[in-house]
C-alpha cells in the first residue's frame, strides 16, 4: 500500500480509513475489517468475536463508531481494549500488581500514555502526535536541510534506524539515503546521522512529553 500510495497515478485516489487512531471513513473501514476477518477466520457458520485496540482517550462517539464498523464487517461480538493495556500485555508486563506502571505507546496516529495498576487504568491520556508525524517532520527536515525529496518509506526507515532512542548517550548512527535533488532534479545519495535528525525528533517528543 505504501508503494502504491507513493506512485499513485492521477486516476487513483488514496484513502486512509483510519486517521489519528479513529475512523475517518466508515465504509472503507468496514471493508478493511472484512478483509482482515476473512483472512484469519474461514468459517461462515459462526460469526467471530473480535477484539479491537483503541486509543486510551477515545470518546464515546468514536468507540461507538468502531463497534458499529466491526459489527457491520461480520462480528457477533466486539471487545474494545485500551492500547496501553494491550501494549503492556504484549510486552509481558504484569499489570495486575498494585505498583503502578507507566506505559507510553507511540502508534501511527496517536501516542497513548497511561498509568496501569491492579489490572486497569489509573490515569490515561492520548496525544495526537505519533509515528506518522515523525515521518512527516523527518521528510520535511531532509528536504529543507539537504534540498532532497524523499518518500514516506525512506523517512520511516530513517526514523527506525537512525532517529531511535537507545540507552547510549553517545549514540550517533548514520544511514545512506537516496532521493531526488530539488536543485538538479537528478537522483542523489547523502548520509544522514542521528544528530542531523535531533531537531525534528525532539520537537515532537517535547509535544508528547
Regions picked out by a protein language model, each given a short descriptive name:
Residues 2-106, 114-209:
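Nucleotide/phosphate-binding catalytic cleft detector across ATP-hydrolyzing
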Residues 109:
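Conserved Rossmann-like nucleotide-cofactor binding loop
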